[in-house]
Regions:
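Small-residue-rich transmembrane alpha-helices
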Residues: 28-40, 74-78, 110-140, 152-177, ...
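Juxtamembrane interface at the cytosolic side of transmembrane helices
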Residues: 72-82, 174, 251-265, 575-602, ...
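Selective transmembrane-helix segments that form parts of the transport pathway or gating/packing helices
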Residues: 14-20, 104-122, 157, 195-205, ...
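Nucleotide-cofactor and metal-assisted catalytic machinery
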Residues: 315-560
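Peri-transmembrane interface segments
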Residues: 15-22, 33-63, 79-81, 89, ...
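N-terminal Sec/SRP start-transfer signal
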Residues: 1-28, 192-207, 247-297, 591
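Alpha-helical transmembrane segments
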Residues: 29-59, 133, 231-232, 241, ...
Length: 686
């Protein structure tokens, strides 16, 4: 009998809380598909460091389970409160508390089981889309595979129902202590509103807003110099300020009403302000939590887009040659070249020397002008629009460790070698006027070089060479063809200099096997001890032998392992937050039925009342979303600016945040429309 009653109630519950049920289905589907990445045997064989994605997805799953458990316990508490009179009726009919507990447990688990099974079925198809995206991101091909993954299913089952059981156990004590009088009063608790001190509440809200401004200002001006402890403290204070905002926001509305602002009696504003103020006061902690979830969702998706653009554009820029090998000055690279030619007769290989004349003029200029060296005594304001240039005739004082980023002397390359490499990469040849030299540098550094870079002359062949042009094409400049930069001069001028090191660059058509890659590594035994690193921070490989196929695969794998969990967390957090908003609004349809009847008695037509309900729902939905959009938008604008400067990608804040916001709005509108249609239908139900 109790089982039959539980199943009947479960069938009714999923209809009454359809948005909650659909969200559980979506979370189960998303979780099942992402868990497939953890346990798929083919993925584990793609990379030797496949554990990276397992670790990142494990961390993402942990944070998702926290929010999922919060959602389920919130909804269980919410349903217990809304059905308190029903439980009181059961007690009046002579049921024991233990029996009521079994009924509620049974229907809750039945609802979860239905959502889980349906989500698993949908997850089988969602898994194909996810795997196709994943393989595309790492540069592999994927064929549809609907095979059943038992470990993935068991992992999802364990995570999903662990959250359910924890949420039910959390409320077990309430069932034991319930009584008829308490249950009858329970569904009226939200109506007991304490206004408290309005001035204190308003000041609390304004303090939260003030910290938002402080947070953005500090992040903009000091973001690059903050250490980890400072960042953690700022984030903790930001979360606290979000809760402070909602803790006193209702007081601001109340003060506005007491002062009888000009817009109070315009249309239905009085009704709307009172409803929103009441809702904020009873849900201020929930609103704060929802704002945090919305903020994390937008930030996570925006950061994932940044990483995705970086891996798609900058990795190939860093490693344009199929193979780059660095050797000592005396190295001939005969063994390496013979190995490459043996592996691929169509390979185009060029061996050349890099020289130096003992000068440090351009190196000094970089050290005194790049932002990367500002904290060591450089002056980044000497760039475009900055103040007077620092002297390029003497080195600034630097810690010993900083020299490893650049060679001790300016590296030079012959013009013939430079053009040979440009032809290999498909670039047009560079011209050079007599008495001049070229600067080959990274694109991201160009904006940090001032116009005074053209004043930097370098001694060579008994004369001073002037800067005739700057090139920023992809050129493998993390220590091989210079570190961040290399100078190019006429062959007869450069050949008078001292040989610095030997370099081999090769373009190999097709794909190399693991055995071929191993053979190339084994062929190089004359290891160099003079390699520099440059100033890149996102991806940096300091080694004599660079094989682009391997480095691109590792880079794409690593960044995809970070970006996909961010999207995973963002989608789940967004759905959870919108579910809370929708269920809260739909549950009030009974109360609003009376309000609508009152408005109708005052002369408002049904169309006007529906418009008022639309405004009320819009305000209710926007209340936790607007602060999240402002905070995340401000953070993304600042972070993306620093990201573009640090990596050289051509994106902007609009590219990252705009795309995330577009996806956010799309999902938001689906939930909002579904909630509005259901709300209006329930309000006018006879």
């Amino acid at each position: 009998m109790l089982t039959k009653l539980s199943l009947r109630n479960a069938g009714r519950t999923w209809k009454d809380y359809l948005v909650f049920f659909v969200t559980l289905v979506l979370i189960a589907a998303i979780m099942f598909s992402f868990n497939g990445l953890l346990f798929d045997p083919d993925i584990r064989t793609l990379e030797t460091d496949s554990y990276i994605i397992a670790v990142m997805l494990g961390i993402a799953t942990f944070f998702i389970l926290l929010v999922l458990a919060w959602l389920i316990q919130y909804m269980i508490r919410f349903m217990m409160k809304k059905r308190s009179r029903e439980f009181a009726t059961y007690l009046l009919l002579g049921m024991k508390r233990r029996q009521i507990t079994h009924i509620f447990w049974g229907e809750s688990l039945a609802l979860g089981a239905m959502a889980f099974l349906l989500g698993t079925i949908i997850g089988l198809f969602l898994r194909q889309f996810l795997f196709a995206c994943f393989y595309t991101l790492i540069g592999k091909s994927y064929r549809l595979d609907f095979s059943w993954n038992t470990p993935s299913f068991l992992m999802t089952l364990l995570c999903f129902f662990s959250c359910y059981l924890l949420a039910l156990l959390f409320h077990q004590k309430k069932f034991r202590g319930m009584n008829i009088a308490g249950l009858v009063r329970a569904d009226r608790e939200n109506e007991c509103i304490r206004e408290g001190n309005l001035i204190t509440g308003a000041a609390t809200s304004l303090a939260g807003i003030a910290y938002f401004v402080i947070f953005g200002t500090v992040l903009y001006f000091k973001g690059g110099s903050l250490d980890n402890d400072d960042i953690i403290r700022m984030i903790v204070l930001l979360i606290l300020s979000i809760y402070l905002l909602y803790w006193g926001l209702a007081s601001l509305f109340s003060l506005y009403l007491k002062k009888r602002g000009k817009r109070i009696y315009h249309g239905t504003n009085l009704f709307l302000i009172r409803q929103l103020s009441s809702k904020i006061r009873t849900m201020r902690f929930t609103f704060g939590t929802l704002t945090v979830l919305f903020t994390l969702s937008l930030l996570g998706c925006s950061l994932a887009l940044m990483l995705n653009q970086y891996q798609n554009t900058q990795l190939i820029y860093k490693y344009p040659f199929s193979v780059s090998i660095l050797g000592n000055a005396s190295s001939t690279m005969e063994s390496e070249q013979a190995t490459i030619n043996g592996l691929s007769p169509d390979a185009v290989t060029h061996v050349y020397k890099v020289y130096h004349n003992g000068g440090e003029q351009m190196r000094t200029y970089y050290l005194t002008h790049l932002r990367a060296f500002a904290k060591y005594g450089g002056n980044p304001d000497n760039g475009p629009g900055g103040g007077a240039s620092a002297s390029v005739d003497s080195l600034i004082s630097m810690p010993d460790g900083i020299w490893a980023q650049y060679y001790n002397h300016d590296p030079f390359m012959r013009l013939s070698d430079y053009n040979a490499l440009r032809r290999m990469l498909g670039f047009p040849e560079a011209g050079l006027p007599e008495g001049g030299y070229l600067l080959q540098t990274k694109y991201r550094l160009l904006k940090e070089l001032g116009d005074d870079v053209y004043q930097v002359t370098v001694p060579a062949g008994g004369s001073e060479l002037y800067l005739a042009g700057i090139y920023t094409d992809a050129f493998c400049q993390d220590g091989h063809n210079g570190s961040d930069y290399i100078l190019v001069a006429d062959d007869d001028v450069v050949e008078q200099m001292e040989v610095y090191y030997t370099e081999l660059a090769s373009m190999i058509p097709g794909t190399l096997s693991d055995e071929q890659i191993g053979a190339i590594y084994s062929s190089h035994t004359d290891y160099s001890d003079i390699i520099a690193s440059g100033t890149d921070t996102m991806t940096l490989t300091i080694t004599d032998t660079l094989i682009s196929q391997e480095l691109l695969a590792e880079g794409k794998w690593g960044y995809t392992s970070i970006s996909l969990p961010m999207v995973y967390i963002g989608l789940v957090y967004l759905c959870v937050a919108l579910t809370i908003l929708s269920v809260q609004q739909l549950s009030d349809s009974g109360k609003y039925r009376y309000h609508c009847q009152l408005l109708s008695s005052l002369g408002l037509r049904r169309k006007q009342i529906n418009r008022t309900l639309l405004k009320q729902m819009s305000w209710f939905y926007l209340c936790p979303i607007l602060p999240a959009v402002l905070i995340s938008g401000m953070a993304v604008i600042i972070i993306s600016g620093k990201f573009v400067n640090a990596t050289g990608v051509s994106g902007s804040a609009f590219t990252y945040f705009g795309t995330s916001f577009f996806i956010f709005v799309g999902i938001y509108l689906l939930y909002f429309i579904a909630a509005y249609v259901g709300f209006v239908r329930d309000v006018w139900k006879e």
